[in-house]
Amino acid sequence: MPVFQYQVRRPEEIYALSMELAQHFPDPSTVQIGIYELLLNALEHGNLAICERLKIELVRQYRWQEEVERRLQLPQYRDRHVDVVLELEGTACCIIITDQGDGFDWQHYMTPGNRTRDRLSGLGLLMVRHAGFDAISFNEKGNQVRCSVAK
């Protein structure tokens, strides 16, 4: 089984990696947005500890990028990276994304009806649920997600 490993640390690395990873899946255009959102969530919420409430405020004030750049320089965050593993099994393509944060309550966000339409945050995981993955699972801590698609 071929296994490929990657790391990302900055937002500008995420799009290119999501495009590259998606090419290994049967329907790249469908899974690419899900991969992108998972990588972005791992970086901003996991590694940089930007909570949902703060993200909403930063987006409304057009200061999200500024805050991400500021946190990337802070001692407690500057050495963090997101680990990505792509496994090409005989019958499935699988991606495993792990951040170095404290994790989150993924059950809340993956349960239909727990998100309201007027919220600016939580949309990424909602998109992931509809991104063409056959299976999505999180570790107990909530800092690792595994998504797979049958070949």
Predicted regions and their residues:
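Glycine-rich/acidic phosphate-handling loop/turn and adjacent ATP-lid/helix
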Residues: R53-G122
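Flexible, glycine-/charge-rich segments associated with ATP-binding catalytic modules
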Residues: M1-V8, A92-I96, D102-D105, Y109, ...
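Residue-level signal for the start and early helices of compact helical domains
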Residues: A22, L39, Q73, I95, ...
